[in-house]
């Protein structure tokens, strides 16, 4: 209900996972929107719309793999390594951009983005699995010493409700964040003549997601290991 939605907005786990979910789900949206424009701008001799569907298609296909891996290895660890890949891929794409005296490499550029799309897809699945586990775990801890099965079941229901509310809110935040990617490309090109600045910025953002995942959820003594 509305009360649960309002309460969850004040929860720090809500904002942590919104940050990470923006890195995966938001990136999927933004990359899909911005990739054709970026290729056509940097490699004008190529019609990017002939193959622009490949990245989003691969991301959608591998999303279930992220959930499957999260169930077996742990969502936080999968998400951590996904953000490692996502931090490197934009720098690789920037390396293959055309520069003065060089035509760049379309193949290298596209492959770097394919890696970014696949990582975003897998990470979308793994972060999606993390959210309900986080809130269920926190609620279970509150009644763990009561030795009361009814209290435990009630706590799990509350955790499930909070997890569902967080998924909805995080999805909205991530979708909004996804619109930033094409805007960042355009701004970088307008100011510097190249999207390289935007790509470096994205790499730094994914690095922050990687470090956040490790600190909050992946390390052995994390607040909520999942």
PLM region descriptions:
Residues 11-64, 124, 128-129, 181:
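Extracytoplasmic gate region of multi-pass secondary transporters
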Residues 51-59, 170, 174, 205:
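Transmembrane alpha-helical segments of major facilitator superfamily
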Residues 62-75:
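Helix-to-loop junctions at the C-terminal end of transmembrane segments
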Residues 76-127:
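C-terminal transmembrane helical hairpin of 12-TM major facilitator-type secondary transporters
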Residues 145-191:
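A late C-terminal transmembrane helix in Major Facilitator Superfamily
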Residues 201-226:
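Multi-pass alpha-helical transporter architecture, strongest
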């Amino acid at each position: 209900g509305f009360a649960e939605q309002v309460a969850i907005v004040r929860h720090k786990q809500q904002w942590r996972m919104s940050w990470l979910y923006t890195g995966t789900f938001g990136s999927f949206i933004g990359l899909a929107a911005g990739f054709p424009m970026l290729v056509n701008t940097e490699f004008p001799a190529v019609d990017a719309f002939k193959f622009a569907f490949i990245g989003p298609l691969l991301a959608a296909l591998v999303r279930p793999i992220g959930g499957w891996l999260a169930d077996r290895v742990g969502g936080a660890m999968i998400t951590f390594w996904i953000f490692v890949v996502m931090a490197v891929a934009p720098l690789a794409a920037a390396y293959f951009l055309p520069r003065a005296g060089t035509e760049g490499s379309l193949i290298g550029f596209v492959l770097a983005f394919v890696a970014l799309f696949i990582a975003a897809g897998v990470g979308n699945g793994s972060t999606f699995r993390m959210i309900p586990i986080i809130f269920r775990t926190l609620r279970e801890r509150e009644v763990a010493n009561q030795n009361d099965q009814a209290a435990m079941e009630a706590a799990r229901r509350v955790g499930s409700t909070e997890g569902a509310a967080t998924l909805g809110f995080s999805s909205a935040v991530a979708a909004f964040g996804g619109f930033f990617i094409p805007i960042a490309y355009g701004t970088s090109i307008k100011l510097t003549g190249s999207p390289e600045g935007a790509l470096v910025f994205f790499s730094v953002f994914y690095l922050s997601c990687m470090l956040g995942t490790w600190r909050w959820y992946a390390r052995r003594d994390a607040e909520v290991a999942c």
